[in-house]
């Protein structure tokens, strides 16, 4: 297969931050493999209109047993994977006091955010390392959250899942450094998406009060621009780095 463009695989690329990332990568010249639990033909059509090849692959991140087949389908369609963006994830099943946290809810979020991401990455890395030809810079970019280091007691399970990703990224960066695959973590802060729309009024007040030093919401395009920059290959020597996409939210203050 004669490839003229690099290929990025974006999990959860159908909406929200994932869609913002997909748009930015398409604008950067990437072909796109989008995975999600549901398809949205309008989104796929929009991304194809940006000039590259785009294909959708249905997949549930929690279903680890399906990961190898999903990666194989992507390879059959595109020939290789140059960039993996681990974006898919979920919030707490129920917010509330830690004393009321249910084991089944804890297992659900870990199954998607941590276990699912770790083993999907494993499947992609095996394919990357097996590639006989490397034509473009390669990277694995994991979208975690400022919640990996800034805790919220009412959604402690979510914070734990993101903190686990932080540890994973560091170990993965060491494992893949010699293969010259850049590994990065991007931590979004308060980002305007359909998931945050239900608490927009609360966040508006907090942002106006100075919680975010830039005093504005983050947009999905802010995260997308960071990911596209990392995927381009110019920051390979900074492997293992963490980028806070939060307008200064996580800066330690007196």
Task: Map each language-model feature to its residues.
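Conserved glycine-rich cofactor-binding loop
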Residues: 14-15
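Short C-terminal tail/terminal secondary-structure segment
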Residues: 95, 210, 228, 239-254
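Substrate-binding pocket helix/loop in short-chain dehydrogenase/reductase
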Residues: 95-98, 102-107, 208
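Active-site helix of classical SDR
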Residues: 121, 161, 169
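Alpha-helical segment proximal to the catalytic Tyr-Lys
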Residues: 126, 174-175, 236
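Residue(s) in the substrate-gating loop at a strand-loop-helix junction
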Residues: 145
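Short, small/polar-rich loop/turn modules that mediate ligand/substrate recognition or access, typified
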Residues: 177-182, 238-240
């Amino acid at each position: 297969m004669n490839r003229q463009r690099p290929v990025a695989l974006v999990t959860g690329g159908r909406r929200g931050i994932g869609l913002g990332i997909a748009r930015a990568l398409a604008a950067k010249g990437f072909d796109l493999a989008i995975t999600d639990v549901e398809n949205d033909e309008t989104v796929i059509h929009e991304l194809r209109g940006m000039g590259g090849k785009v294909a959708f692959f249905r997949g549930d991140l929690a279903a680890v047993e399906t990961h190898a087949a999903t990666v194989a389908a992507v390879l059959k369609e595109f020939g290789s994977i140059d960039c993996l963006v681990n974006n898919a994830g979920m919030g707490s099943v129920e917010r509330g006091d830690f004393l009321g946290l249910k084991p089944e809810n804890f297992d659900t979020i870990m199954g998607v955010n941590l276990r699912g991401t770790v083993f999907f990455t494993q499947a992609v890395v095996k394919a990357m390392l097996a590639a006989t030809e490397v034509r473009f810079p390669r990277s694995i970019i994991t979208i975690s959250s400022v919640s990996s280091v800034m805790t919220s007691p009412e959604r402690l399970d979510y914070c734990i899942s993101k903190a686990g990703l932080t540890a994973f990224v560091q170990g993965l960066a060491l494992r893949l450094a010699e293969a010259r695959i850049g590994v990065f973590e991007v931590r979004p802060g308060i980002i305007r998406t359909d998931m945050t729309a239900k608490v927009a009024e609360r966040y508006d007040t907090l942002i106006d009060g100075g919680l975010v030093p830039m005093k504005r919401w983050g947009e999905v395009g802010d995260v997308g621009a960071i990911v596209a920059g990392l995927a381009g290959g110019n920051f390979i020597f900074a492997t293992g780095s963490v980028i806070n996409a939060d307008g200064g939210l996580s800066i330690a203050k007196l």
